[in-house]
Amino acid sequence: MQAFHSNWTRPFFIRNPHMEYRIEPFELLTTALSALEWRRENGSIRMICDTPAKRYYESLGLCFLWDDGVYPLLDTMPEDINATAFWAAGKLYALSAVPSPCVMLDTDFICWKSISNLLDGPDTAAIHREDITPSIYPEQTAFAKTEGFPLDSFDWTVQPFNTALAYFGNDEFRRYYTDTAIRFMRCSPDADDTLTYMVFAEQRLLSMCAEKKHARAAALSDLPALFGGAQNGYFTHIWGFKQQMRENPELYEDFCRRCAARLQKDFPEESKTIANIAELSPFFA
């Protein structure tokens, strides 16, 4: 199964206009685990990014993580995409360039086992459904900055998907979803909320589009199973743990050391290369 990571750096440079691009150590380590475990268990993986991201990975010697290559396709993303509100827009543009069947995978999401048996049947699948929490997934009236997009043509009762991992087995549906999500973003250049607009475009529209097109859609897990261990060791998603680590240096270091130890155990040769990176080497000591 073909998978891809993505990395669009424009949001970073909007937040940090005078900084050199960098990725935190724990994110580099989870990126390595995500790519290498995918290759071992599920197939090939590529990185779709922009030139600053590619140069950064090259400078660290990490391009080998993606056996299918590193492609700066996101250099061509339109300038009118609001990169503050739509900070993950690069994922959707990357998906628009990858034919089905494919898996869209976040760099902080790790598949420890083969998932081919879970993907037999659906046109699209994602890691889990999300509750319609009003502060995250508000009603249609919250999108006052969106003009020219048919918000009222969708079913607002359908639970959104979390797309840390998303599978697209039907190419017609993949194109419909990405076209719809990109259209929404381009109809919202003045979007003024950094959460609700993005998760609508990426996560809520996926389930809405599936409902509208009568596509077969599946959730591969659920939140209690994902974070309680009941999903039999298939998945790890770091997302909810990031802020805790940033606030607790001991937790941060312990996590990085555990990632390094797992890399050394599962990928002894590759881990030697990763351990040579200056900002990562202390965690391999």
Regions inferred by a protein language model and the residue ranges of each:
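Catalytic core and acceptor-binding pocket of nucleotide-sugar-dependent glycosyltransferases
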Residues: 156-246
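Short glycine/proline-enriched coil/turn segments at helix->beta-strand junctions
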Residues: 41-44, 97-102, 120-123
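N-terminal anchoring/stem segment of glycosyltransferases
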Residues: 1-78, 241-285
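Conserved donor-nucleotide/metal-binding helix-loop-beta segment in metal-dependent transferases, i.e.
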Residues: 111-147
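A conserved donor-nucleotide-binding helix/loop in the catalytic core
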Residues: 26-28, 32-34, 76-104, 112
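Short glycine-/acidic-enriched loop or helix-start segments at secondary-structure transitions
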Residues: 57-59, 104, 113-116
